[in-house]
Amino acid sequence: MRILKTLALCLGMAGLATSALAQDIKVRIEGAGDKGTVHLYVFSTAQGFPKEESAAVHTSYARQNADPVEAIVQVPEAEEYALMAYQDKNEDGKMNRLLGMIPQEPYALSRNPQVMGKPKFADAAVRPTAGEVIVLKLRD
């Protein structure tokens, strides 16, 4: 009987922990116009930011038919996040880059930092609060 009570307590606590391990982030992506697909990546660490889709804790794609694009995305609980979005105008499934570095399609980072070279996670990191909308402004 004692084992069953312990098991029930552990399962109950696991349920509480699971619900506390996720949060919703509200995102608005401005400047996309009406062509292509908008890709959104959310990173919770510098690992893979901003290029490696597989390192993102959330990825989503939206066929562009409205500006702005608005979404509520569920991500694992973390202290901070860095978001990257781009508009895949030619719909080839990737961000086209000149010499493998310079974006050739509209893109945006959270906090909209001015960057020369590869952006740093710390420059784009945000700590969203309940109800806050993170605005990403696409630029060429």
What are these model-derived regions, one by one?
Residues 79-89:
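A short, solvent-exposed beta-strand micro-motif common in secreted/extracellular proteins
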Residues 9-10, 20:
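Cleavable N-terminal signal peptides
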Residues 25-32, 40:
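A short, amphipathic beta-strand motif
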Residues 90-97:
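Acidic, glycine-anchored loop motifs typical of Ca2+
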Residues 16-22:
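Sec/Tat signal peptide C-region and signal peptidase I cleavage site
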